[in-house]
Curated annotation (Swiss-Prot):
Protein residues bound to [4Fe-4S] cluster: C62, C66, C69
Reactions catalysed according to its record: (4R,5S)-dethiobiotin + (sulfur carrier)-SH + 2 reduced [2Fe-2S]-[ferredoxin] + 2 S-adenosyl-L-methionine = (sulfur carrier)-H + biotin + 2 5'-deoxyadenosine + 2 L-methionine + 2 oxidized [2Fe-2S]-[ferredoxin]
Domain of life from the UniProt record: Bacteria
Name this protein carries in UniProt: Biotin synthase
EC primary class: transferase
Cofactor: [4Fe-4S] cluster; [2Fe-2S] cluster
Keywords: 2Fe-2S, 4Fe-4S, Biotin biosynthesis, Iron, Iron-sulfur, Metal-binding, S-adenosyl-L-methionine, Transferase
The keyword rRNA-binding is assigned to this record: no
Gene assigned in the entry: bioB
One Gene Ontology biological process: biotin biosynthetic process
EC code(s) of this entry: 2.8.1.6
């Protein structure tokens, strides 16, 4: 418990070694859960969840070859490429999200990097969403330092740019963008004064050491991610990694919980978010993730191109777990529950 006591007594560490992170993964499951829950309670109210909603504002046709992604132009997944949405449409979707209880609205575009020509339309989206009282987040691929400053000036609060996996396995995931380019974009975001949203995907065929390496990278950044999404791969037919996982099997649920728990311990102040793959998780598995330190989720029925649980199911789960959203939003029982 020495490392955990240090986490409770001081600001988060940035000097984790990879062997130390691996040792956390190797703890007996119940001990790991206890340590993660202890850290979580030191920094957060364990009964609160942050609710975010993500909208794909530009879908498909991406030039990247990320082996998990349905939106890559390199693979035949049946997804039709679409143009960048108009700001008015995005703002209307954000209003619906706010009225549904979301506190943060994220906008995602399927392209390799942000083009300067799209900045005015994106700035209008950001300003309109912010005017609704929502936190704003965007995931728009690689940025230059100047673009990061312009997004900050437009009012963007958070920028998402995932590392996806550890550097050792990264070459098996994507070859059109280097690991260093991802780190550079995160540096531009930090330097511009925006908060970072950065995590990865598990269940892509990587080893436990690769998962530890990803979390080691995140825990040794100059500042820990403000939001740390943990995605479970949703296998998409026609993508290399999706087809591989369908052949070889998906990640074990308890191993996923271990990943969430270690993320909580090494990045104690981050909002650890259950992201893609939650629709395939049982209520019990989600509850274990919350106990392990996850305190943020995506809602809204869809995450870019993959499904999420519907709000009625989420509301019932939150009620049964005695959990509530952060802020002023309230979860109300769906009609089917209220009638029981």
């Amino acid at each position: 418990m020495t490392q955990i006591n240090a986490q409770l007594a001081h600001e988060p560490r940035h000097d984790w070694t990879l062997p130390q992170v691996e040792a956390l993964f190797d703890l007996p499951f119940m001990e790991l859960m206890f340590q993660a829950a202890t850290v979580h309670r030191a920094w957060f109210d364990p009964s609160e969840l942050q609710l975010s909603q993500l909208l794909s504002v530009k879908t498909g046709g991406c030039a990247e070859n990320c082996g998990y992604c349905s939106q890559s132009a390199h693979f035949k997944t049946g997804l039709k490429a679409e143009k960048l949405m108009d700001a008015e449409v995005v703002i209307a979707k954000a209003r619906e999200a706010r009225d549904g209880g979301a506190q943060r609205f994220c906008m995602g575009a399927a392209w390799r990097e942000l083009k300067d020509r799209d900045l005015p339309k994106l700035a209008a989206m950001i300003g309109g969403v912010k005017a609704l009282g929502l936190e704003t987040c965007a995931t728009l691929g690689m940025l230059t330092a100047e673009q990061a400053k312009q997004l900050k000036d437009a009012g963007l609060d958070y920028y998402n740019h995932n590392l996806d996996t550890g550097p050792e396995y990264y070459g098996d995931v994507v070859s059109t963008r280097t690991y260093q380019e991802r780190l550079d974009t995160l540096a531009y975001v930090r330097d511009a004064g925006m908060s970072t949203c950065c995590g990865g995907i598990v269940g892509m065929g990587e080893t436990r050491r690769d998962r530890a390496s990803l979390l080691h990278q995140l825990a040794t950044l100059p500042s820990h991610p403000d939001s740390l999404p943990v995605n479970a791969l949703v296998p998409v037919a026609g993508t290399p990694l999706g087809d591989k996982v369908k052949r070889e099997g998906e990640i074990d649920g308890l191993e996923f919980v271990r990943t969430v728990a270690v993320a909580r311990i090494v990045c104690p102040k981050s909002m650890v978010r259950l992201s893609a793959g939650r629709d395939d998780m049982s209520r019990e598995l989600q509850a274990l993730c919350f106990m392990a330190g996850a305190n943020s989720i995506f809602v809204g029925g869809k995450l870019l191109t993959t499904p999420l649980p519907n709000m009625d199911d989420d509301s019932k789960l939150f009620l049964d777990l005695n959990m509530r959203p952060m802020g002023s939003a309230k979860i109300v029982a769906p009609e089917s529950v209220a009638a029981e």
